[in-house]
């Protein structure tokens, strides 16, 4: 196994551990902290903070700390959110949500930069297309990462399953899109579990999050340590402002502007499943203790399809996969418009998340890979833009979650999906007419001379902004 592959696995399993905790907690927020919409508002604050941090933090942190330590520091911000849920209140939830959000964009930008550099270098070493290796690395990452939903949701369902309640039949009429009640209303079987069970779950999540930090800090190679050290010692205020503005400078590229709807839609579709489907369908008709089991189906489907699509892309191309994802989401949204959820239709509760997992696997793996391919010379700024616009989709969706009807939310998501496919296909057409040059070995090398103690030729440097 090459060092690049080993590092990809370390990053992947580190994220698996971290998001076993955060992913499970996010799926429960709309049901666990339903009072006055506090749960979804906290999620909105998270992604608003991610937007703010995307404007300047990722390039600055990555250039100064390197990818590894940016990931480690940012992981600590995620663990803080689990602590905030131990005593849920407006002050504790909103403050820890903001902390998590500030670490969110650097975390994902550093991860994407790490995988993209590794894929390009591995491709150069074995005389393969860099974009094929990037697709494979993102496929491996999301295959491992998306399985976090299995373990996080399994933990929540097993723990909360000790305190089950039967849904009154008269409450079932309020599930789905058939009625349009004030979303602040606690409907169906959304009673909060006992404090003892909640604290037990949060204790497990905190422990897993801390384990993720230790795992990455110990086993992940610091591939750009020397470049980060040189950057800190030789660059001054001018470079700070250049780095600060790098995210915004990239917006002058029309390709990035055309990818904004696609990136925002990723936020819309993820927030719908975690915020609307779990609350208005699963919790309402089956009870909060079943949210985890249903979301396990999504996570398993997402994980397997992420790995498969990452490898399949080199044979089918991106366009076919994006069209497949759009068709799946279109059919799912239309189905949710007309489906009346009932406990007797148990299998259907699992069908929608399974289909959603297939589509989301495409949105995640292929959009990340597309950014890495189109903006190879500005990866840090490109992935910062990715997180910023995806987070804006989350913010908008979570912000209106408690104010408009569920059917209206579905129509909005469908409109964004239509715009997404139009702009994305134009980007692909432009890429076909004017292909982006492949990254070369010389471009990947740092400007400074190679150090004598660089024994491993797989260790690669971070590209320059």
UniProtKB/Swiss-Prot annotation:
The chain crosses the membrane at residues 8-28, 40-60, 71-91, 96-118, 140-160, 200-220, 256-276, 281-301, 319-339, 343-363, 410-427. Belongs to the unc-93 family. The keyword Cell membrane does not apply. It comes from the Eukaryota. GO terms for cellular component: membrane. Keywords: Glycoprotein, Membrane, Transmembrane, Transmembrane helix. It comes from Danio rerio. This is Protein unc-93 homolog A. It is found in: Membrane. Disulfide bonds: none annotated. Glycans are attached at residues 183, 189, 237. InterPro entries: Ion_channel_UNC-93, MFS_trans_sf, UNC-93_regulatory. It holds the Pfam family UNC-93. It is a multi-pass membrane protein.
